[in-house]
UniProtKB/Swiss-Prot annotation:
Protein name: Monopolin complex subunit LRS4
Subunit structure: Component of the monopolin complex composed of at least CSM1, LRS4 and MAM1. The complex associates with the kinetochore.
Chain positions covered by the region annotation Disordered: 112-183, 208-230
Biased composition (Polar residues): 131-140, 155-172
Keywords assigned: Cell cycle, Centromere, Chromosome, Coiled coil, Meiosis, Nucleus, Phosphoprotein
Phosphoserine: residues carrying this PTM: S168, S230
Post-translational modification as stated in the protein's UniProt record: Phosphorylated by CDC5. This phosphorylation is required for the location to the kinetochores during late pachytene.
Annotated coiled-coil segments of the chain: 46-118
Organism: Saccharomyces cerevisiae (strain ATCC 204508 / S288c)
Amino acid sequence: MTTLLQLLSNYYKAKLDSERIYNEYVQSQYEFASLDKLNNNKGDPKKVVDETLFLQRQIAQLNKQLQLSFQENEKLLSVQKNQKALYQSKLSSKDAFIDDLKLKLKVEQISVDKHNKERTPSTGRDEQQRNSKAAHTSKPTIHLLSPIVNRDKPNNQTNDRGGNDPDSPTSQRRSRGLRSLLSSGKNTIFDSISKNLDDEINENAHIRNDTTSSKIAGKSPSRLSALQKSPELRKERNNMILKEHILRSKDDQNITSSRKLDNIELSSIGDSTAMTSRSSTVNANDILGNEENDGITKLKRVNKLTSSPVKRDCSTNKKRKLTKQRIATLPNSDEELSNNLNVDEFV
């Protein structure tokens, strides 16, 4: 029994000792935790002060950097303004130099043109002739109202629509016929002859005026005065011719009246003196009026012929161009005409 009791007593003693040790440990932990808290509360304001001081230093550095950057920007802006003014002055000087060169070139061109005009005064006429030739070539070709092939070929260079060349033999070429020509809307010689003639007359008149002006410009002032006086002299000559013509006609009438009186009896003359006198006066007045009208018309014709040499040339040019157009529209041979006038293509 003694051994069991001793064992129980030892057990409870050991248990009490263990609880006591545990309690002491817990108390010691609480004490350490409270001390740490107190220490932490004491160190916080120091850290805040340190951080604020550090931030203030950083702000001061940044302000210095900003001021430096502003100063650098101002310097760069001043440099840029100076460079801009310098380049603008250079550009203005170069522009003035270019304008001077242009003026010099214009003056030189004007002097060269004057020199060329003095040497060759007929350059304008040559240019107008070239322009008139270009206009003639650009005009549409005229064809007669007949199914003849290759009529609208300028200078025999373009090919036919069917792929036939104008230089190929007649057996290989195909005629298009009258219906195709009419449906294609081409002008016939009866449609466009008046327009072409008017254009040619106007062009010839311009060319003639240019030639006369160039001839007059090349003449001396004495010749110009003589030319200006020439129409007056012509008018005087024409008036003299008219007067001579009227006087001759009056003399002829007097001669014829005397011859008629020789054939008439005296009794009839005595009875019809009043009638003959009246009729003679009326006839004389009519004849004089007709003669004056004829003289005026002749004067007008003479003045037109003397003052306008362009119309003769225009009429001759008309006839020549009409003959050329008719010759151009005719076929080259009888074989072409027989090949072109196929009965199947008319139907």
